[in-house]
């Protein structure tokens, strides 16, 4: 078996590492650099440039130089985040025939997976040159908050690059692996990962070679690119005030501004003032114009303060989901180039109440972790168990449009969980299983991932058939759902495909909506529960009345029928309290009928179980079969 490499496919830079004996080693590229810019360019004559050569010519070829394409991977063209990106990049973002966001140069379109594949190919070639052998297997990292579509698109990129992707792992988890492997560390750590395009925070417990993720949170559209653009807009605004020319309308000038902004941002991490000097940035009738400006660290920090503050809330949510306070975190590990910014380090220190750990290289630690995971899969690294989590709850729609969770967010993967459901109608011979992902109480408020039908259920009264629905999530976070009729053994299953994935804006919207609408969700859930209970009560009372109505006197029979009529009327509305009140009235009125049925059963000599039909729809038995395997 050949070497398995670890690749950090970053928004701004990528890095490749491999196990060398008992430790992981970062491999230098052909230009002698330990990281490679995640940039792809198409030249005038159609040549493809990747990495540093592509970055060097970006100023003279802005429309055919693709950067930060990772932010488009697995996204639909009509995604609000794509709309935002279109105004920030000089290259064209177009709508593909499948509705995804692709990029275009000289009339030729490329999917984000393709562009990412060009970068992965460069990583592959770098590793092959160093190892002197062919490499065809890799572990690739993704942001922890990446959804199914984005994970699948990343796997596709690996395939296009000629790599079999053995495992997709989360970036903060990889960083924790690199941080904790060679140290006899035990405790709870927080990984704060602010990279070029994404932000993740993960809380992990480390001990005896086990790396267990307790919770994860993040924002997949927050990173260094946003800090750069904030500075670009400031420089452009200042120049426009002075010269009356908007540099953002000139793609070449915009690219020069972007490079200058990135350089100034980096310099201000180690110095308190820098000078931005861009001669001949543009020209008008009076001649050439130059941009010269001094920028202090304080001014830059003021420009991006809200971006830094946006990282605080995901950290608090991750702590809450893990059931921990900031004081219970033993170490905070910084990952991603943006964590070199003093303001970011200051915010992390304030939030967690301790100095963040700076002993790892924030640009390389993720690739090193990926290489360690590759070593685990290859058998070169022993006694390491990696347990990651799924970022969003998964479940199905049950009677009344309720979202019934089968796997909660932050559940350790790989995992397999089942629940038993039943039918809502008498003699129902098929059920439609609709699979959703999200945090809201009602299915319609969440994202539908897919649906399938389970056919051939034998005729039976409602509530009698037992249909077992099973969710199976593998170590890559890829979902399988199956439904099985326990009586016949008939089974159907669905694999959630890339087209069923969520956009990050949808994920964030779901969580934020869930918090904002928690009270409303609870009220709607209560109304549906009351309706389901009332429906079952109406059904069982009607059946009992038809079979045993003659055993009660006329006045009691009439009061039962009146109560039935009132409850049916209440069921036409959504007033949970009214439905509950009418249900109680019917239950009281039906007591004499129950007594008559019980007496008859006693007289028959075999006391039978009464009220067998009073089944609450969508009641279930939970089967919890968490599989904690080596990731």
UniProtKB/Swiss-Prot annotation:
Region of interest: Disordered: 602-631
Function: Acts as a chaperone.
HAMAP family: DnaK
Keyword Chaperone part of the UniProt annotation: yes
Organism name: Rhodopseudomonas palustris (strain TIE-1)
Keywords, comma-separated and alphabetical: ATP-binding, Chaperone, Nucleotide-binding, Phosphoprotein, Stress response
Gene3D superfamilies per record: 1.20.1270.10, 3.30.420.40, Actin, Chain A, domain 4 (3.90.640.10), Substrate Binding Domain Of DNAk, Chain A, domain 1 (2.60.34.10)
A Pfam match: HSP70
Entry's Gene Ontology molecular function annotations: ATP binding; ATP-dependent protein folding chaperone; unfolded protein binding
Disulfide pairings: none
Name of this protein: Chaperone protein DnaK
InterPro entries per record: ATPase_NBD, Chaperone_DnaK, Heat_shock_70_CS, HSP70_C_sf, HSP70_peptide-bd_sf, Hsp_70_fam
Tagged with keyword Signal: no
Modification Phosphothreonine occurs at: 198
Domain of life from the UniProt record: Bacteria
